[in-house]
Amino acid sequence: MSSQPLTLQAMMAAILNFWSEQGCIIHQGYDLEVGAGTFNPATFLQSLGPEPFRTAYIEPSRRPQDGRYGQHPNRLQKYHQLQVILKPVPENFLSLYLESLKVIGLNLVDHDIRFVHDDWENPTIGAWGLGWEVWLNGMEITQLTYFQAVGSKPLDAISGEITYGVERIAMYLQKKNSVYDVMWNGSLTYGDITQYAEQAWSQYNFETANTTMWLKHFDDFSAEALATLDQGLPLPAYDFVIKASHAFNMLDSRGVISVTERTRYIAKIRQLARAAADKYVAWRESLGFPLLKTPPSTPTVTPKKIPTICQPEDFLLEIGSEELPATFVPTGIQQLESLAKKLLADHGIAYKHLEVLGTPRRLALCIEGLSHVTIRPESEKKGPPLSLLFMTDGSVSPQGEQFFPSHGLSISHRSALDQPSAICRVRSINGTDYLFLVIPEERKETAAILVNELPQLIRSIRFPQKMTWDNGGVEYARPIRWLVALYGDQILPISLGFVSSGNTSWGHRQLDNRQLTIPSSNMYVDTLRSACVIVSQKERRAIIKQGLQNLTGDQIVAIAPEHLVDETVFLTEHPFVISAQFDPAFCSLPKELLIAEMIQHQRYFPTQNMQGEITNRFLIVCDNSPTDSIVEGNEKALAPRLTDGNFLFKQDLLTPLSSFVEKLKSVTYFESLGSLADKTSRLKLHLEEAYALLPLCAKEDIDTAIHYCKADLVSSVVNEFPELQGIMGRYYLQNASLSRAAALAIGEHLQHITLGSNISTTGALLSILDRIDNLLSCFILGLLPTSSHDPYALRRQSLEILTLLYTTQSSVDIEDLFARLIRHFPSSIPNTVWSPEEVLSKLNTFVWGRLRTILSSLGFDKEIIATVLTDNCPKNPLTIIQSAQSIQELKNTQILKTIAATHNRLKKILASLSFSVTEQMFSLQSAEDLLFKQALDRFVEETTALPISSKDYLHLLKELAQSTELFLDSVRVASDDESTRNQRIALLIAAQKCFGFYAWDVL
């Protein structure tokens, strides 16, 4: 970076001049309020159709909701985007962008520049694309996008969009902590020119804007857009689309648009934008697309000779691309490995070892000892019996006349088969002669197979999203820029779109950005290492883990969730771990908020002391050699994030909780079931019904917890960090000096619950009721999970309900609980036909399936689980789990063996008898009958107050089993006397019921 940083206007002029030299038209910002440079017709309209176009311009952008009254260091309601559109996008798109940074004084070697996954979308105008946020030492400075659709229309030619955040770049260049301190020119700051306007417009946007007027504006502008389109004027019509969009943004900032209404407004603007796009393309086509001077090129492939490989060799396929999203690389690794193994297996190609390596810029298939040929030995295929192919006189039968030509055989008589043949032969099986076709040995060169199959293999790699970047007909996660295909030291000629394979790869984009010649496939890893690329993801992970450990110690530990470690592994090709600091004053913010800001927004590793308190040190995984500029830049990048978090948190603390609760009325839970306020009211009814069954905590605490449990959903912090819902509610209740137990419960009720979770009793009850309401809601609305899709996490929530009932030792009939709580839902729901009986039947079946999972996770084997989970078992999860525990402890003892044997004997005897006993009318005559009846009565009396899950119950059941065996050994059940026979059958039926809670026959 130069010693004298550029002023804001000099910097913008330098970038515009750079792009002017690249053939761009230098437009001015549009003369309407737009939310982003994409709205400018030079982008929105010019991206449509096949006509090439290059432009650059500075767009003043209005986002009313982003206003911070001129107090935030870089959050503004009006800011500037320097927009570049390159259509069609050139192959050196990223290189051109990096060159443009040099003209403003950035020495790329000194900085950590990242291309971070960003799938951009503007649903308001039906535009989306794939690309990146560009980070300069942790600060997002640019957005790069390959447009895929605009105006809800797939594009004829792909445009590359570059959106510079000029204020942020200027802050970095001038080393300013606030945008308002940036020098606009040599004498005036950004604040001198804009800060008062930011204050005034924030007040207007949030407090005083006339919503009635803006609502009317939206309707008027929408109507005028349609009317103008009807007149065949797409350019004026699109202006009114822009105006309608700004009216919507104003209404949104005033908070007068509910979630449901917001969706409707966006859909309306998107429809208008689509109509304008259609009219525009039709208009340009009617003019003959005047800017289209030459037709687009198509790929041409010149066949190249496939090399001859004479022995097994190592093989390398490297797919070199622009930076893949970090979460896509593991997917690509897995896909490439499975596809390659299948390809080799399908063709019978032998190899020693196969591995796939991956970095942001490459996926590499490395195969050790790949056989140079695949040989399929001669084989035979059984055909029809000769009796079907020939007549008795040896002539060919009608069936034979069809069979022989269809298999390329010229046979006119049975005698032709008497001569030795290389194509067919006769074999006798069990006295019947059959014709066997001979499939000759087949030898194929592996190189030829790979040349033919690898292009399709690459196309078959499935990513969460794919894109196109030219008219080469290839889709991939990001543009493919090179291919390496080496079999030993020989190049396999592979073509994919406009890209052909070779033996040249590329080094690290910043540390050693040069083209590399790979001498042979077995030198791939070392050659890449020489250019500062650590291609092995395992090695990069080890470096990061060790770096995190080295920079902490006995008193401080890194907060390093595995998903963040994974992401940093695949954000880097040569990782370095460095330490930085932020202002200790921010440590007073909620720990979870600080962690979210650092991990989610910045991919930093926070640290905490041994007491679990957050510290002001954080760790950075960068992809360039550490410098003071990188450390300082990341510290400056985090400061605004923490400032914004502090601003949002303080704003929430100043808002009464009652105001949050009131706002829940305008937040939709499920459209057919009303708002979150309606859900909260339903939870209160659930509590009144369930508290007697689940008296886990003080009533006043759970009352408070339910009243406020959803309040933080409308808070500023949770709007920015949805994953902090519940957690922030705890802080807001504490700030309001409400019940500590209620505050803790709210903080706990959305956390994932496992058998090892530590949760308060109030939190447990709130969690149970909230999850039951979610289950009932989804089952009533028919939103059931499928085998592969569970968008509302109903499986997890049902597991958590059962886990909480077990860990709190809550004994309750869960089917009865569901039946009680379902009464709190309206019997008539819009667009939904439902019956409580049908819903409860499906829900009960679903939940019992999850109880089986709980039992398995507790270590019970399949036989125990099948024994306790029966149609006759109690509908009490705790009882069932305790029963499994008791049976597990007594497994393999004589007690259970006796019970099981007697149960099975009873079952077999009763199944063998024909009877119709409807009442137990006992007038017992024999001593054996009377003695057995006394044993049955004694068992019922002694177990009346005894849980069936207890071992004492099982001991008593064993005693009954012994009495039953004695009875069966002493009498003839099928007595000739009908009365005696019926009485004894009735006794056995009564005994069987005593055994009937469990499926003893599976033990």
Swiss-Prot record:
Q: Which UniProt keywords apply?
A: Aminoacyl-tRNA synthetase, ATP-binding, Cytoplasm, Ligase, Nucleotide-binding, Protein biosynthesis
Segments carrying the region annotation (Glycine--tRNA ligase alpha subunit) are 1-310
Tell me the segments the record calls region Glycine--tRNA ligase beta subunit: 311-1003
Q: Does the keyword Chloroplast apply?
A: no
Name the residues that span the membrane.
none
Q: Carries keyword ATP-binding?
A: yes
- EC code(s) of this entry: 6.1.1.14
Gene3D superfamilies cross-referenced by the UniProt entry: Bira Bifunctional Protein, Domain 2, Class II aaRS and biotin synthetases, domain 2
Q: Which GO terms describe its cellular component?
A: cytosol
Query: Do you know which Pfam families this protein is assigned to?
Result: DALR_1 (PF05746), tRNA-synt_2e (PF02091), tRNA_synt_2f (PF02092)
- Output the InterPro entries linked to this UniProt entry: aa-tRNA-synth_II/BPL/LPL (IPR045864), DALR_anticod-bd (IPR008909), Gly-tRNA-synth_bsu (IPR015944), Gly-tRNA-synth_heterodimer (IPR006194), Gly-tRNA_ligase_asu (IPR002310)
Gene Ontology terms: biological process: arginyl-tRNA aminoacylation; glycyl-tRNA aminoacylation
Sample GO molecular function, one term: glycine-tRNA ligase activity
Where is this chain's protein located in or outside the cell? Cytoplasm
Q: Which reaction does it catalyse?
A: tRNA(Gly) + glycine + ATP = glycyl-tRNA(Gly) + AMP + diphosphate
Tell me its family. Belongs to the class-II aminoacyl-tRNA synthetase family.
> Can you name this protein?
Glycine--tRNA ligase
Taxonomy of the source species = Bacteria, Pseudomonadati, Chlamydiota, Chlamydiia, Chlamydiales
